[in-house]
Amino acid sequence: MSLRQLLLRLSGYLGASGPPSRHWWYFRSLDSISSAGSWRGRSSRSPAHWNQVVSEAEKIVGYPASFMSLRCLLSDELSNIAMQVRKLVGTGHPLLTTARALVHDSRHNLQLRGLVVLLISKAAGPSTRNAACQNYDMVSGVYSCQRSLAEITELIHTALLVHRGIVNLSELQSSDGPLKDMQFGNKIAILSGDFLLANACNGLALLQNTKVVELLSSALMDLVHGVYQENSASTKENSIPDDIGISTWKEQTFLSHCALLAKSCQAAMELAKHDAAVQDMAFQYGKHMAMSHKINADLQPFIKDKASDSKTFNLNSAPVVLHQEFLGRDLWIKQIGEAQEKGSLNYSKLRETIKAGKGVTSAIDLCRYHGNKALEALESFPPSEARSALENIVFAVTRFS
């Protein structure tokens, strides 16, 4: 049986019903990218679609990113967890969506972080300052330890996704399903997320590099800190969001969405014995690409067609924060009040109000600014297919129409 067949069998085992109607602590990751025009220049391939960019990048590193953590996903322990997850089919628990996304990578590309780590490892190549590094085993231009790091990065990210799929029982409504189903799903989410983190910690220890352990440990700490800040700043429906500026937003976003990729890219350079300058450029690429990607995701409700106008959006997203910053706190609160209808916030009306201001265009400019910073960091790496693929990823996340 092929690896693809194994993955499809696992997805079928988890059930084929649609996604749950409501998520609680689940967040959008580096998954959904729009395709539109670029600004700074074009890569040699000038990619038009996100899936095309990812597919070409996977060919360069040797295998699809969705297979990177396959050894963990097909372990006996996780097979037992999958049997328990199957019991959640039909309950609408967010854990089901995460599980399906892990095996249906064609649409969601949850494992982008590991792919970027492999690409930047190949783009940098072996270190010229340490001859001992030349003796390490290398496949498709990437050391085995760097491939292990890519898997570890994905395990950490996936564990966070699973943990953030926990249902907030205090906000549970009768329409969400029986309480016992949600409690059971929460237990499985906690245990399976902990299992993935344990595998990541074991993999880190096997790398036998204390600096890499320190980098990934600090990235995990940043993630937890960032998620805590997001949960503290998150607002219930129809309530006034916190008063934060774009500088504070960027600090929080770095912790929750950028730190893992940035420090994993730096760790990949450390494993290949590159000097501090190369490590810093890898860090800067990961940081700014992830930041640009997050802003792109925040912009989607404001640049898509009217089919999505009825949907809600995050009142602490980049375009909204910038809109409030330009407008002033008092006028922003007034606009929220004007968008209230029968005790409920009319997101369609508020969206049009925000689109009429400067927040959306400023967010697009900010997205492109960070994209430019990511491209500048890549200039320190020699020209190669891997570097072009990294550039294509930046072009894809900074294109709008």
Swiss-Prot record:
Reactions catalysed according to its record: 7 isopentenyl diphosphate + (2E,6E)-farnesyl diphosphate = all-trans-decaprenyl diphosphate + 7 diphosphate; 6 isopentenyl diphosphate + (2E,6E)-farnesyl diphosphate = all-trans-nonaprenyl diphosphate + 6 diphosphate
Keyword Transferase listed: yes
EC numbers, comma separated: 2.5.1.91
Gene knockout outcome: Homozygous mice for PDSS2 are embryonic lethal. The oldest PDSS2 embryo identified is at E9.5, and its morphology resembles normal E6.5 mouse embryo, so the development of mutant embryo may be blocked at late gastrula stage. Conditional knockout mice lacking PDSS2 in cerebellum show severe cerebellum hypoplasia during cerebellum development, whereas conditional knockout mice lacking PDSS2 in Purkinje cells at postnatal stages leads to the development of cerebellar ataxia.
UniProt subcellular location: Mitochondrion
A Pfam cross-reference name: polyprenyl_synt
GO cellular component, one term: heterotetrameric polyprenyl diphosphate synthase complex
UniProt-listed GO biological process terms: cerebellum development; isoprenoid biosynthetic process; regulation of body fluid levels; ubiquinone biosynthetic process
Keyword set includes Lipid metabolism: yes
GO-annotated molecular function: all-trans-decaprenyl-diphosphate synthase activity; protein heterodimerization activity
Pathway: Cofactor biosynthesis; ubiquinone biosynthesis
Protein keywords: Isoprene biosynthesis, Lipid metabolism, Mitochondrion, Transferase, Ubiquinone biosynthesis
Domain of life (superkingdom): Eukaryota
Function description: Heterotetrameric enzyme that catalyzes the condensation of farnesyl diphosphate (FPP), which acts as a primer, and isopentenyl diphosphate (IPP) to produce prenyl diphosphates of varying chain lengths and participates in the determination of the side chain of ubiquinone. Supplies nona and decaprenyl diphosphate, the precursors for the side chain of the isoprenoid quinones ubiquinone-9 (Q9) and ubiquinone-10 (Q10) respectively. The enzyme adds isopentenyl diphosphate molecules sequentially to farnesyl diphosphate with trans stereochemistry. May play a role during cerebellar development.
Subunit structure: Heterotetramer composed of 2 PDSS1/DPS1 and 2 PDSS2/DLP1 subunits.
Family note: Belongs to the FPP/GGPP synthase family.
Protein name from the UniProt record: All trans-polyprenyl-diphosphate synthase PDSS2
Source organism (scientific name): Mus musculus (Mouse)
